[in-house]
Amino acid sequence: MEETGIKSIVIKEICDIARKYNVQKVTLFGSRARGDFKARSDIDLAVQGGDFIRFMLDVNEETSTLLKFDIVNLDEEIQNELRESIKKEGKIIYEEI
């Protein structure tokens, strides 16, 4: 996932937190998924299933990055354009099998 500018340890931490809170799927989207990010671009995540609030809090507090996160709950209503964008350009970084 280095092409996203996100260190592999941070991806692992996100996956561990997803597992901890029974999240079904985490998708990276936005500039980091497209590859047109800047050094300080935030990390956009779309989340399905599990305890969204606790996942979001832990990702913001317990990952070893100073980058900001923008986390969207796909189990709630979001703009159709955003949902389509996530579907089109998103990269799945965690999926419960």
Task: Name what the model sees in each region.
Residues 1-25, 33-39, 48-97:
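Catalytic core of pol beta-like nucleotidyltransferases
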